[in-house]
Amino acid sequence: MKNFIRIFAALLFCSGAHAQQVLRMGSIVAPASVQAQAMDRFADSVKKKNVGVDIRSFHGSQLGGGPDQVRNVQLGVQDMFMDGMTFLSDFSDDMRMAETPFTFASREHFEKWLQSASFKKIQEELIAKGNQRIINLGVSWRRGPMRVLVAKRPVLTLEEFGNLRLRAWQSEVITRFYGKPGLGATAIVIPLGDVYVGMRQGVVDAVTLPFDLVQPMKFHEVGSHIMLWDEYWQVLPMNISEKKWQALNDAQRRALTESVDEAGNWYNEQLAASVEKWKAELVKAGATIHNVNRAPFVQRIAERNRQWQKEGYWRAGLIDEIEKLR
């Protein structure tokens, strides 16, 4: 009997040793950003739970740009990635809606959609076509916690926006909605890490981004006008390879989902508590903060959304499903 117990214990030990999982998690943001710090807290929390998972962070586009890292996860050469939802739109036409500007009435409206049957279809498509899933739909990581437009001059009207050379990231959704077909700017695709130099050299006049990234990336040094316009309410999806997810046991999965929610709560608290401090620091550094009337922008996008839905840009009926959630 004692021999049986010793053998059984040895098998358990071997099983635990072989269950060790090392996950490579990437981002495109600066290591000093609140997002990167929160991701690192997530990794530390998982490690402390002692379930045999070691998450290693790679920030600042070390593993490539956003589209590259999403593709890495799809192919299984990278395990996890966290950034905007538009990077996932290749796998679901409906995902295009997630980061369209001036579509949702409020953050509450947007997050209600994330919990709806409509968004569940997107998760299913993401798994089937992208070989990855979002694991942090319990606690939304409220990026920013709002988005701003940083520019070399004030931009308060549609006409002024249409005269911009605006940095866009590598996404057809973004170039369509912010560019000439949508809000009217000239969209210039450059990596986020190149925007500072691009603005200094005149390649672009402006960049739209989460408020919490303005200071860490020093964009206020090259664009002294900051427009508060909430063009959309962004959340950060934590994507994991579906193959890797299926290889985890129940305890490991639970450790990941619990830890990502804990880190998400910390992230949200840090950002919410820092907004006024950041505004004051930016003004002290020479920036001017402007409020923007969203109504003309909302009207323009409402027209484009209906037009592009008729053309099959996303599933018929999607806009009506979203409107019913107001």
Tell what function each PLM region has:
Residues 20-110, 118, 127-326:
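N-terminal secretory/targeting leader peptides
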Residues 9-12, 57:
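Exposed boundary/loop context
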Residues 121-122:
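Core domains of carbohydrate- and sulfate-ester-processing enzymes
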Residues 15-19:
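Sec/Tat signal peptide C-region and signal peptidase I cleavage site
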Residues 2-10:
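Sec-dependent signal peptide recognition
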